[in-house]
Regions:
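Secondary-structure edge/capping motif, primarily at the C-terminal ends of alpha-helices
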Residues: 35-46, 66-69, 85-95, 117, ...
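Short, well-ordered alpha-helical segments
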Residues: 51-55, 69-84, 98-106
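Extended amphipathic alpha-helical scaffold segments
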Residues: 2-6, 29-39, 63, 73-86, ...
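Beta-strand-dominated lipid-handling architectures at cellular/organellar boundaries
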Residues: 56, 63-65
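Structural secondary-structure packing elements that flank or coincide with functional cores
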Residues: 1-18, 91-144
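Long, amphipathic alpha-helical coiled-coil segments characteristic
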Residues: 12-57
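Solvent-exposed, non-transmembrane amphipathic alpha-helical segments
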Residues: 48, 59, 82, 86, ...
Length: 144
C-alpha cells in the first residue's frame, strides 16, 4: 500500500476541484470586481447600461467554469447574477432598486464564498441559498 503523493489532487467528500479554484481565484476576483463596478456605474448613470451586458456575459462564463469544477452552488449564484444584470439592462428605463441591491449583495456574497471555500477547503451551499432564492424571486423563478 502506497501513500498518495503530495502532488496528487486533493479531493474532498464533495469532489469539487479545489486546485482549479485556487488557479481561477484571480480571474474570479476580476470578474466580480468588474461586475460590481459596472453595476455601480449603471446606478449612477443609466446611460451606462451597455456595461451591464459585459458583466452578463462574463458572469455566464464564470457560472459555466464553476460548474466545470463542480462548485454547483457557485454556478447557481453566478447564473442568477447574470440573469439579474440582464433584467436590469432589459428594464433600464424602469429603475429596480431592489434588484440592484440584491445583485450587489450577490456579487459580494459570491466573492466571500469563494474565499471561504479556499480557506476552509470545503463547501457550504447553505451560505448562498438565501441570496440565490432572493434573486430567483426577483427574476420570478422558483426558489431552490
Amino acid at each position: 500500500m502506497s501513500l498518495p503523493s503530495s502532488n496528487s489532487q486533493k479531493l474532498t467528500a464533495t469532489n469539487f476541484d479545489l486546485p482549479s479554484l485556487h488557479l481561477l481565484r484571480p480571474e474570479i476576483a476580476v470578474t466580480l470586481h468588474d461586475a460590481e463596478m459596472h453595476l455601480s456605474e449603471f446606478n449612477d448613470d443609466s446611460s451606462q447600461a451597455p456595461l451591464l451586458l459585459d458583466s452578463v456575459d462574463t458572469l455566464a462564463q464564470l457560472a459555466k467554469v464553476l460548474r466545470l469544477i463542480q462548485l454547483e452552488e457557485g454556478y447557481e449564484l453566478a447564473n442568477s447574477l447574470s440573469a439579474g444584470l440582464q433584467k436590469l439592462y432589459d428594464e433600464r428605463d424602469r429603475p429596480n432598486n431592489d434588484m440592484m441591491m440584491d445583485v450587489s449583495e450577490g456579487i459580494m456574497t459570491l466573492a466571500r464564498y469563494i474565499e471561504f471555500v479556499l480557506l476552509k477547503e470545503t463547501i457550504e451551499p447553505s451560505l448562498l441559498l438565501p441570496i440565490i432564492n432572493q434573486l430567483h424571486s426577483d427574476l420570478n423563478q422558483p426558489g431552490l
